[in-house]
């Protein structure tokens, strides 16, 4: 995936994972109440985040055109492996204007 990142976030892992999340990790993200999508994580100034760690970085989503206008600054989305929540990502900046909620802009 060679696209630019869609969002900048603060990652918070909850200790559920057994191993650190390495740069390039591709979990699912609960974008809306009923839409999970894959996204690629890149972490600033670190190669991996511990299972209960936090980091700032970016997410590049697989198919942002499928869930337009669904994100806003401050929204907290689940990071999941299947149905298991392994952490959260809080949106701090939206680079892809297609994703920016018109109601909360």
Show where each model-derived region lies.
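C-terminal effector/interaction modules appended to NTPase cores
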Residues: 1-105
């Amino acid at each position: 995936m060679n696209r630019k990142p869609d969002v900048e976030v603060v990652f918070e892992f909850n200790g559920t994972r057994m191993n650190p999340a390495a740069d390039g990790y591709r979990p699912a993200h609960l974008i809306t109440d009923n839409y999970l999508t894959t996204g690629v994580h890149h972490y600033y100034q670190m190669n991996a985040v511990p299972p209960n760690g936090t980091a700032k970085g970016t997410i590049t989503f697989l198919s942002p055109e499928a869930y337009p206008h669904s994100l806003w600054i401050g929204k907290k989305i689940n990071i999941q492996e299947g149905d298991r929540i392994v952490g959260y990502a809080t949106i701090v900046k939206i680079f892809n204007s297609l994703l920016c909620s018109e109601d909360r802009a």
